[in-house]
Amino acid sequence: MFKILLVCALAALVAANENAEVKELVNEVNPDGFKTVVSLSDGSASQASGDVHGNIDGVFEWVSPEGVHVRVAYKADENGYQPSSDLLPVAPPIPEAILKSLAWIEAHPSKE
């Protein structure tokens, strides 16, 4: 299922800009995993590699309409999809009062 999603994402990347030319296209499928690379003349690119256990590491990037270079690296494994990028939002730190409450709850477990 994930391979179908990956192929669709690559097709969408290629179709995103009709004027962009494919600079590099690699699709290797081996008994121990796969590797795919797509690079377009407009700066868009996608790379992914996976193993027989379903673990996938990859990166995709493009230049936004504002001229900002966007790059997202990801890992997909038994823990799910884990993207990382400077442009992704980051949760605020947990307030000190909540941390103290959690510590108190841990130190005083329910009697049930």
From Swiss-Prot:
The keyword Ribosomal protein is assigned to this record: no
Signal peptide location: 1-16
Limits of the Chitin-binding type R&R domain: 31-92
One Pfam family recorded for the sequence: Chitin_bind_4
Record's keyword terms, sorted: Cuticle, Signal
Gene Ontology cellular component list: chitin-based extracellular matrix
Top-level taxon in the UniProt lineage: Eukaryota
GO molecular function, one term: structural constituent of chitin-based larval cuticle
Function (record text): Component of the larval cuticle.
Protein name: Larval cuticle protein III/IV
Organism: Drosophila miranda
